[in-house]
Amino acid sequence: MNKFFSFPILGLLLTCVRFVVAKERLFEWNVTDVYDVDPDGSGNSRWVIGVNNKWPIDPLVVDYGDQVIIKMTNSLANNRTTSLHSHGLFQKFTPYMDGVPQSTQCEIPPGATFYYNYTALQNGTYWVHSHDMSQYPDGLRTPFIINALEEPYDYDEEYIISMTDWYYTPFNILVPDEFKTWKNPTGAEPVPDTGLFNDTANATFAMEPGKTYRLRFINIGAFNNYDVMIEDHNMTIIEVDGEYTEPQEVSSIHLTVAQRYSVLVTAKNSTDRNYAITAYMDESLFDTIPDNYNPNVTAWLSYNSDASYDLGPDIDEIDSYDDAELNPLYSWDVTESNHSINIWFDFFTLGDGANYAEINDSSYVFPKVPSIMIANSTNVDGYNLEPVTYGPYTNAYIFEYGDVVDVIIDNHDTGKHPFHLHGHTFQVLERGEENAGLYSDQESHTYYDNPMRRDTVEIEPGSFIVIRFIADNPGAWVIHCHIEWHMESGLLATFIEAPEMIPSISSPDFVKEQCMLDGVPTIGNGAGNYKNISDLSGAPSPPGEMPAGWTSKAIGTMAACVISACIGMGSIIFYGASIHPVPTEELDENDDLQEAALENAAMFLDTDKAVEKVVEGKDEIK
């Protein structure tokens, strides 16, 4: 289909499709805390966030064209808000359903109910998760499958296989106490305690000889990448991130946080044994590796429940492949880009002593008004066409409808980062190898033919990536690193797409009423000012830069240290120089020890006189 097809006509056609094939699929979610959960059987029980007092949360499964309604009631304890993002869905014509607080909606306050209501206009493997306060690593996430009306590949059965890193301590404790604190100025991310398949240990998937299975792998974790292998089985990739690919046979797949793969696996004819599915954690992401740490997670293809579940031989090296070499099954006929932006990111310690991410020298902070409502309410005199209107730290970029945009992302950091763009899939035009340097450092650039499309892509350390998308989806779409620690650090930007068209798809009244319950304004600029849109005073901002040189506080601290050191040295000198003779009758076989002690005391003294005093003391003792 021509990507520049008329927006109104496309909307009419999609509406017609809904009348032909749509079913209403209502999911009633009461979001609750669930206690005493021990998914790996280690004895490390903790609370999690579940649905209807249950965890793990059942996957959502619908068909293409269905009307999806998630009635989400916030019953969390301790006055916590929440939200729900359908990861990978474009939300065409419903951008206010994307579930990102202060971007497309307001948080769902305690006791309130919000209806996520949209049409499933894609098919493939997705997931839903909270986009609020690091809640999804604490359990508020589950796979979301949209079945195609007609599948391009044949298979007999399918399994959904989620994988996640798991922490025994909840994130609402880890973030303030161990990560985003002056005690962690380098931003070292807490290492997961373990990993899980389908939120449990030793998950099994029954196999029947000769059948072909579609395995939908989804990394719903917070931090870690996984390399996945199936013992003595090859896999054929047919889908990544909701995009069908040309078939590619591989021995392993690499999933960053938020990525998805569908692979076909044909079962063996023999049932004399079972085979391990092993996910290997990418330990290069960890600043430190705990003693006796097990980086591997295991599930099983079960051919015979009476046979043993024995691990095969250890793997010395994983035969990896470059996912950028994958080709989409349905190619895009995309013209050259007419718009290009270059963003870079790195991490810095700011004025509060904690570590923050910055995109082009700016750490993301939520605006006072949700970005999509800023675009809607400042549509006068061209204010909604100016990035600064959305807040000085919203990292906003403006695109016109139909722009073909190249986004060059330079990674100044020493770690890998999975970047995700809401509202789109994108072409991966070029990706530099590890430590290749910046995009501008390269002597030449060669873009892939029929490049892979997906919504989450990994950027190598000290390197770059080039992605291309078409700005055909009016709305406010965040682009961010999907490592949860880095989202907490501010590694986000906002793409404001076709702002002049956003008022025509304005947020419904019930979305705005949700903001009123939250006490959040729905009109104005990023500072919440609507009478004078150019006035950004009071806009939220990150901590200031770490002061250079000696501040008064630092001087005072150093002075206190020097005074304490002088007092300590003075005490040593005073007591060392005031040694009194010991009566001879008290000397015994410990005399040598006493001499050694006196000699050690003399090491702390700087003057010859003091040393002589110690020697005299020794002579008097003798």
Curated annotation (Swiss-Prot):
Its cofactor is Cu cation. Cu cation 1 binds at residues 85, 420. One of its GO terms (molecular function) is ferroxidase activity. Residues 1-22 form the signal peptide. Cu cation 3 binds at residues 131, 422, 480. The lineage of its organism: Eukaryota, Fungi, Dikarya, Ascomycota, Taphrinomycotina. Cu cation 2 binds at residues 87, 129, 482. Could be an iron transport multicopper oxidase, which is required for Fe(2+) high affinity uptake. May be required to oxidize Fe(2+) and release it from the transporter. Essential component of copper-dependent iron transport. It is an enzyme of class 1 (oxidoreductase). This is Iron transport multicopper oxidase fio1. It is found in: Cell membrane. It comes from Schizosaccharomyces pombe (strain 972 / ATCC 24843) (Fission yeast). It holds the Pfam family Cu-oxidase. The chain crosses the membrane at residues 554-574. Binds 4 Cu cations per monomer. Its EC number is 1.-.-.-. Its main location: membrane. GO terms for biological process: cellular response to iron ion starvation; reductive iron assimilation. Belongs to the multicopper oxidase family. Residues 575-622 are cytoplasmic. It is a single-pass type I membrane protein. Keywords: Cell membrane, Copper, Glycoprotein, Ion transport, Iron, Iron transport, Membrane, Metal-binding, Oxidoreductase, Repeat, Signal, Transmembrane, Transmembrane helix, Transport.
